[in-house]
């Protein structure tokens, strides 16, 4: 018989407050532990049929084969921002996982959801809840609360532990190890970049209609700090979670005139070669110096919070200062990462595809 307990959000918000994300030369804070109300409630018997309404946590469960094989549904964003060639090569059965229970308006279609016969549903935060208790099965909020909204290591370790605890699986520490390895490896280079006061723009969207940047208290802001860079948008006022990703004008970007630009959902090539009408990117220092880079896309876009994002600070330093971290080092570290994290020997052609400029 399926567990029918709804895990209330207040239990998840009772986690201790984590300190502010440090500069690149400091370690990350310890991850929050799943509260007892989560850890104590595991599904009895065999592993369940798992549904995940969001995208970022799916990458974490991909690293746990015992859990992954029971996923039957995931939000469409998990596939929209992925390199399907990589996903299908790594997980040949990925096609069995459906996103059809999410409507075009991104609301849950309860009839389609129930057709999946889920035993447990994971969601992230109030915006993804969508009255999931109607399904009559165990639901788990993966929002650790507090400042973890811009602490990627703490967030992913929390997800990894919560998946293991609620599914009755042994805990692993893959993501903690991965983040600690990267932060240790980049420490001297990030410190040198920090001393140079390198000014960076983390460009979330640049589709010709709007420019959206990562302001303070965002993952993007944290990634830049890890790499030793100053976020040019770090002092902008924000309001609420959605406000952390800020619409700005081309005039504002020109006034910032960053040294380097990282493009997440958009094309670095278009920025470099004048492919976006009405935007004067060619006047910027970063464009003139060829310091505009798209974040890699593999299992998901590394620039969000993907299963590969612990490699992102390494990538950022490689692109800005290849004399510190060479292309060969990045390539080898990425190959090793896929093997360690997913037991996946990524082919050379796909590894090149992941790291290619878009």
Identify the residue ranges that each predicted region occupies.
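Extracytoplasmic substrate-binding proteins
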Residues: 30, 40, 128-212, 294-357
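Alpha-helical, coiled-coil/dimerization segments enriched in small aliphatic residues
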Residues: 217-244
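Short helices/loops that flank or line small-molecule/ion binding pockets
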Residues: 107-117, 135, 247-257
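Structural recognition of the beta-strand scaffold that forms the well-ordered cores
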Residues: 51-53, 72-75, 120-124, 139-142, ...
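Bacterial N-terminal signal peptides
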Residues: 8-20
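Signal peptide processing junction and immediate N-terminal pro/mature segment
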Residues: 20-29
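Active-site/pore-lining binding-face segments in mid-to-C-terminal subdomains
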Residues: 259-320
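A short, structured surface patch at a secondary-structure boundary
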Residues: 51-54, 58-115, 120, 125, ...
């Amino acid at each position: 018989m399926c567990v029918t307990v709804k895990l209330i959000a207040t239990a998840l918000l009772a986690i201790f407050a984590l300190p502010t994300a440090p500069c690149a030369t400091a370690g990350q804070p310890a991850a929050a532990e799943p509260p007892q109300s989560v850890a104590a409630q595991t599904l009895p018997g065999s592993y369940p049929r798992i549904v995940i309404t969001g995208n970022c946590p799916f990458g974490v469960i991909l690293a746990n084969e015992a859990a992954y094989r029971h996923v039957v549904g995931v939000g469409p964003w998990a596939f929209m921002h992925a390199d399907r060639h990589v996903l299908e090569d790594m997980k040949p059965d990925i096609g069995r996982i459906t996103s059809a229970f999410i409507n075009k308006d991104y609301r849950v279609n309860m009839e389609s959801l129930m057709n999946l016969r889920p035993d447990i549903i994971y969601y992230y935060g109030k915006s993804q809840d969508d009255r999931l208790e109607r399904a009559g099965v165990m639901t788990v909020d993966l929002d650790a609360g507090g400042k973890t909204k811009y602490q990627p290591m703490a967030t992913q370790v929390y997800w990894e532990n919560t998946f293991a605890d609620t599914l009755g699986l042994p805990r692993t520490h893959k993501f903690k190890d991965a983040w600690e390895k990267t932060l240790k490896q980049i420490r001297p280079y990030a410190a040198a970049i920090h001393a140079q006061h390198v000014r960076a723009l983390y460009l979330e969207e640049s589709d010709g209609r709007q420019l959206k940047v990562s302001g303070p208290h965002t993952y993007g802001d944290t990634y830049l700090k890890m790499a030793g860079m100053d976020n040019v948008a770090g002092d902008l006022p924000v309001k609420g979670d959605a406000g952390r990703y800020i619409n700005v004008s081309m005039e504002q970007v020109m006034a910032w005139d960053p040294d380097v630009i990282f493009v997440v959902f958009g094309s670095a090539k278009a920025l470099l070669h004048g492919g976006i009408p009405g935007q004067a990117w060619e006047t910027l220092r970063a464009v003139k110096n060829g310091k505009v880079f798209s974040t890699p896309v593999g299992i998901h876009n590394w620039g969000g919070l993907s299963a590969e994002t612990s490699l992102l600070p390494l990538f950022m330093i490689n692109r800005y200062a290849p004399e510190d971290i060479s292309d060969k080092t990045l390539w080898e570290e990425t190959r090793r990462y896929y093997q360690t994290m997913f037991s996946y020997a990524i082919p050379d052609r796909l590894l090149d595809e992941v790291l290619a400029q878009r």
